[in-house]
């Protein structure tokens, strides 16, 4: 696998950060289970054309180029710059799926980190109006030619 190659993948799962996980199943990759790629802005069930942007030993990262077949759980994000800013990582997913994702994340953490094997987390309580409530911002700081700067990354 090389950087800048395009592949068609089906998104099978989500990372803890909400990135879609699709596997490239090519014999030459030497991984019979498929080589996992983490792809922002994808939803479980999407069939997507992705471009490899970073390759590690056992996994890689891809950039979404095109949704070929959208998941039934895919919606158009309300925020017009959702893909560019990266602040609303789950906005392309139905709200019901977002709640399921959050529940699975808590269950997995309690099992994996907390060592609680037989834990069952109740369904996540949703909101009547689940939009425009953002209460967290991560603003990176850096330096440019004029000195210290702060802002958001545009993916």
Placement of each model-derived feature along the sequence:
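Non-catalytic accessory regions of SAM-dependent methyltransferases
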Residues: 1-155
